[in-house]
Amino acid sequence: SRDQYDTVVVDAFGSGGSVPYQLTTDEFVAALHARLDARGVVAVNLASAIEGERGLLAQAMVATYKKHFEQVTLFQLDPGVDPAMAQSLMLVALRGSGAPSFASADPELRHYLARRWKGAVPEQDVLTDDFAPVDYFFNKAVF
């Protein structure tokens, strides 16, 4: 089908805890982007640091999503964790040209929006079907 979606959640882990590489590549993200409506949102659950060598997975995934989406943001599920340490993250990618508002009158929503990573994410190569060292990056993050 050629259905369009407003929201897609990618929450898949292979054996050992890593995201299957097929769900991280430029080709997958391009196909995902094509199936979202004009204001669509993708949320990706991943385990990685943000900074340093342990952050290679998150850095590469941010680079890959930025190739296709106007807005890409990371959220720390526990903002008290050192950004150089492995942690649970949510990558959120938005279609549309307008900058998102991370303000809300709802106190519970404000609590979650406050977990947005406001620092820079180091540059990394885009992941492709021919170059996706996801397991290597994941192992660097957690071991």
Model-derived segments and spans:
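Conserved NAD(P)H cofactor-binding loop of Rossmann-fold oxidoreductase domains
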Residues: A12-F13
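Glycine/threonine-rich flexible loop motifs
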Residues: G16-T24
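Conserved Class I S-adenosyl-L-methionine
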Residues: V29, G55-L74
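Soluble small-group transferase modules, centered on the S-adenosyl donor enzyme superfamily
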Residues: Q71-F143
